[in-house]
């Protein structure tokens, strides 16, 4: 901030930055936390008003009449007298802009010309419209803008556009005013896509270079199989682009799984051609004969896989939305791999394959001996099982039982909790606690958080409850940005440590929670539990039952940090007017 006041910074961000960001393509909403816009604050003096017999309605009426922006009209417009030389627009004073101007508003005029001005019955100052909330970054007053993309927007593109726009706007910023992107949810998306890209490259190397080379033992055969991968993946991305999908975590995860599938059909074709060539056929005849024999099985295996993935793309509801891109990506990759195996792979076999030598190279002999040992052992095991069918049946039933038991006993959930690089803390003071008390407690919490080596930045917003989206002087929330993933422990470990430290602040209830795995699905991870008073119980009885539920829920090892922000003990003042005295 430097020499700039928090009020100026907040108002500048609201009027000069917020609207510019809201106009960017893909931006759905720009929300300002702790906003303090400029406003003329008029503090009435009841003693002076009573002495002059002036009411609040009189003052409100004077403000409405004398602080207006309206057209004053024109002079010299037709019909006019002959000889009119000019037509002029009349400009009035319009809306008032400073405290002195508001002080000159005439509230009442007397019969002898005496005037009662607003400054005679009120104290006027330029301040904020509301002081009920505030925002700070690492203890410094700041303007906190939250930017939410539209449902169909690409979050990474929106983040890039926002940074570019802020860079452009920075040239017009006053001195001592700067901007920083401290809370960036796309950092997790970018890191995830990067990790998927690394996994994609490693999978490609492991599957093609290592596994295929080990078993095919020919660089020509390995090259033919390897060429099937980029062709299938390029075709898959083309279909995804045509359908309006993007390269996101779901589609890229499906691509990784598809890598092992797109080479299956190509390997089958190459092995079949090599077998025919070993029988004495030339490359062209071997390819044609192999294709006649395996075309049907290749198509059949593709249809079996499609029978698994296509129905997933048709699931209704939010589950269907989540898995649709995943299923479409896999189905497309499998289909294209089958097409490649029946077209490109045979053509490459006819051009590149050579008959295998009678004796494999020395580098492969050790591997072949081990493979033969495993194959012979497996054959003997199958032979024994065939002679004892009841044993095979028992083993199959036991395996099925283990699967069913695991499915029943394994914990179930909609989506796993992700380490997105940040978490929240909800601060709740006793009901009717002032904003000053709330900010003092949040300052203590901030200092504790910044001492944690895993924490990078802390943004605090007082006077706003993030869980229910309401303004309250006794509440606030803290956004805790963590350092890079490889520089700190996992999210759950950091939250557990922080939660233990924050519980040492007795003035407030502070609960940490992770963000939802999918943006837009609530404000926190986990689930909500609603308690309904169906028999007309009082708020006090409902609160008692709620706390009983909380105590019981926190005893379960599967649950942690179960809490509520609701309370029935809200202190209030009751004003009783003595109507007889007021009428005198």
What residues fall within each predicted segment?
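Short, isolated positions in well-ordered beta-strands
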Residues: 49, 116, 123, 142-143
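Interdomain boundary/hinge elements
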Residues: 73-86, 207
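Flexible, glycine/serine/threonine-rich loop segments and coil->beta-strand junctions
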Residues: 36, 49, 81-85, 136-140
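Hydrophobic regular secondary-structure detector
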Residues: 131-497, 501, 505-508, 513-514, ...
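Surface-exposed amphipathic alpha-helical segments in non-transmembrane regions
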Residues: 1-38, 57-74, 89-130, 153, ...
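Short glycine/threonine-rich beta-strand-turn micro-motifs
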Residues: 37-50, 144-147, 528, 571-574
């Amino acid at each position: 901030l430097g020499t700039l006041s928090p009020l100026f910074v907040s108002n500048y961000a609201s009027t000069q930055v917020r609207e510019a960001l809201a106009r960017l393509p893909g931006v759905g909403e720009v929300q300002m936390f702790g906003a303090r816009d400029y406003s003329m604050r008029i503090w009435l003096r009841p003693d002076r008003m009573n002495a002059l017999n002036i009411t609040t309605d009189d003052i409100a009426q004077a403000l409405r009449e004398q602080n207006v922006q309206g057209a004053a009209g024109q002079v010299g417009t037709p019909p006019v007298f002959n000889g009119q030389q000019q037509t002029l627009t009349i400009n009035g004073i319009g809306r008032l802009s400073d405290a002195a101007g508001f002080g000159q508003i005439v509230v009442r005029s007397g019969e002898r010309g005496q005037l009662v001005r607003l400054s005679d019955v009120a104290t006027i100052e330029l301040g904020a419209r509301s002081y009920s909330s505030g925002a700070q970054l690492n203890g410094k007053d700041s303007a906190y803008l939250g930017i939410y993309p539209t449902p169909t927007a690409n979050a990474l593109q929106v983040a890039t556009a926002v940074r570019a726009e802020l860079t452009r706007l920075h040239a017009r910023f006053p001195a001592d005013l700067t901007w920083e992107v401290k809370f960036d949810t796309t950092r997790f998306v970018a890191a995830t896509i990067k990790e998927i890209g690394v996994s994609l490259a490693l999978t490609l190397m492991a599957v093609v270079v290592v596994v295929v080379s080990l078993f095919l033992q020919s660089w020509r055969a390995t090259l033919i199989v390897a060429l099937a991968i980029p062709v299938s993946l390029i075709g898959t991305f083309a279909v995804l682009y045509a359908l309006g999908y993007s390269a996101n975590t779901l589609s890229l995860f499906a691509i990784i799984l598809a890598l092992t599938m797109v080479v299956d059909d190509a390997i089958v074709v190459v092995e079949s051609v090599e077998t025919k060539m070993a029988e004495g056929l030339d490359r062209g005849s071997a390819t044609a004969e192999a294709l006649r024999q395996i075309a049907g099985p290749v198509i059949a295996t593709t249809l079996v896989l499609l029978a698994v993935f296509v129905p997933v793309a048709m699931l209704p509801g939010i589950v269907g939305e989540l898995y649709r891109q995943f299923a479409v990506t896999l189905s497309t990759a499998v289909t294209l791999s089958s097409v490649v195996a029946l077209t490109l792979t045979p053509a490459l076999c006819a051009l590149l394959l050579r008959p295998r030598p009678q004796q494999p190279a020395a580098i492969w002999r050790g591997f072949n001996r081990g493979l033969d040992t495993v194959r012979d052992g497996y054959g003997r095991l199958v032979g024994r099982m065939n002679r004892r069918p009841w044993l095979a049946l028992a083993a199959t039933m036991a395996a099925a039982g283990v699967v069913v038991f695991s499915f029943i006993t394994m914990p179930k959930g909609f989506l796993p909790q992700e380490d997105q690089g940040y978490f929240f803390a909800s601060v709740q003071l006793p009901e009717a606690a002032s904003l000053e008390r709330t900010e003092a407690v949040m300052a203590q919490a901030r200092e504790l958080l910044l001492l944690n080596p895993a924490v990078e930045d802390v943004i605090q917003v007082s006077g706003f409850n993030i869980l229910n989206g309401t303004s309250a002087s006794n509440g606030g929330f803290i956004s805790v940005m963590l350092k890079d993933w490889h520089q700190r422990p996992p999210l759950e470990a950091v939250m557990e440590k922080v939660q233990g430290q924050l519980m040492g602040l007795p003035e407030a209830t502070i609960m940490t929670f992770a963000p939802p795995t999918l943006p837009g699905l609530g404000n926190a991870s986990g689930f909500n539990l609603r308690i309904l008073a169906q028999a007309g119980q009082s708020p006090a009885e409902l609160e008692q039952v709620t706390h009983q539920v909380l105590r019981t829920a926190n005893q379960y090892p599967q649950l942690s940090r179960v809490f509520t922000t609701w309370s029935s003990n809200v202190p209030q003042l009751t004003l009783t007017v003595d109507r007889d005295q007021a009428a005198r």
